[in-house]
Amino acid sequence: MSVPTVLQKILARKAEEVAERRARVNLAEVERLARSADAPRGFANALLERARRKEPAVIAEIKKASPSKGVLREHFVPAEIARSYEAGGAACLSVLTDVDFFQGADAYLKEARAACALPVIRKDFMIDPYQIVEARAIGADCILLIVSALDDMLMGELAATAKSVGLDVLVEVHDGAELERALKTLDTPLVGINNRNLHTFEVSLETTLDLLPEIPRDRLVVTESGILNRADVELMEVSEVYAFLVGEAFMRADDPGLELKRLFFQERGGVVLGADPD
């Protein structure tokens, strides 16, 4: 009998978690909360506007821990981090809400969004339409659909649910087969390429570069994971990839927003481009 991968363990626990959440708050109540939530802020548009100008469109992640690296940040105040990211030039935020493997929380998303004007993606493992409506109820502007965690029918159902409640969708792929499925099933403009293999948690930036030629020009590519230094950013920009999802490099920094500014907007000589100077 094979040993379950990290992703398989996460998905098994996620199914239990969704059942527990449904038992606590029924779908009708979550739908009521979703209808009364603040209007979406336009996650996809925020990224597309930057990328069209060939400026870094950074999704800055608020993540306390990960299964592979453990706790990334001891001093973890989501509102403070969100304001720091906004000042540093982020286009959007990503907030982990998975409790068991990433030490996330719904409250972190609420706190981060309330502290700034940036659109926010709920970073979690979506396997049930209930979670999509719940994402809108807690204030998310976008949800993540991970192709390796879903069959085509469920992926389409989740995307349709997202559209019905006004959420944008970032679809995430890791290889050619997943990309083919995503392009066939979904019409979202946002295609995330995760440089991390979710079964082994190994990272290679070549994943983005290898898949890039297969993606239609009308989709915006978001490179995810493994962007740690200026050379990594330049490697992507020379291939006309301008949208980035970055977490670890910022979470380990004393000032996450300052690290964002340094990594994406500061050229040699200290000149800052594209971000607010204050």
Curated annotation (Swiss-Prot):
Enzyme Commission number(s) of this protein: 4.1.1.48
Class of the enzyme per the UniProt entry, highest EC level: lyase
Designated gene of the protein: trpC
Keywords of this entry: Amino-acid biosynthesis, Aromatic amino acid biosynthesis, Decarboxylase, Lyase, Tryptophan biosynthesis
Gene3D superfamilies: Aldolase class I
Pfam families: IGPS
Catalytic activities: 1-(2-carboxyphenylamino)-1-deoxy-D-ribulose 5-phosphate + H(+) = (1S,2R)-1-C-(indol-3-yl)glycerol 3-phosphate + CO2 + H2O
Functional pathway: Amino-acid biosynthesis; L-tryptophan biosynthesis; L-tryptophan from chorismate: step 4/5
Organism ancestry: Bacteria, Pseudomonadati, Pseudomonadota, Gammaproteobacteria, Pseudomonadales
GO terms classed as biological process: L-tryptophan biosynthetic process
NCBIfam families (alphabetical): PRK00278.1-2, PRK00278.1-6, PRK00278.2-4
Protein name listed in UniProt: Indole-3-glycerol phosphate synthase
Domain of life: Bacteria
GO molecular function: indole-3-glycerol-phosphate synthase activity; phosphoribosylanthranilate isomerase activity
InterPro entries, A to Z: Aldolase_TIM, Indole-3-glycerol_P_synth, Indole-3-glycerol_P_synth_dom, Indole-3-GlycerolPSynthase_CS, RibuloseP-bd_barrel
Similarity comment text for this entry: Belongs to the TrpC family.
Source species of the chain: Pseudomonas paraeruginosa (strain DSM 24068 / PA7) (Pseudomonas aeruginosa (strain PA7))
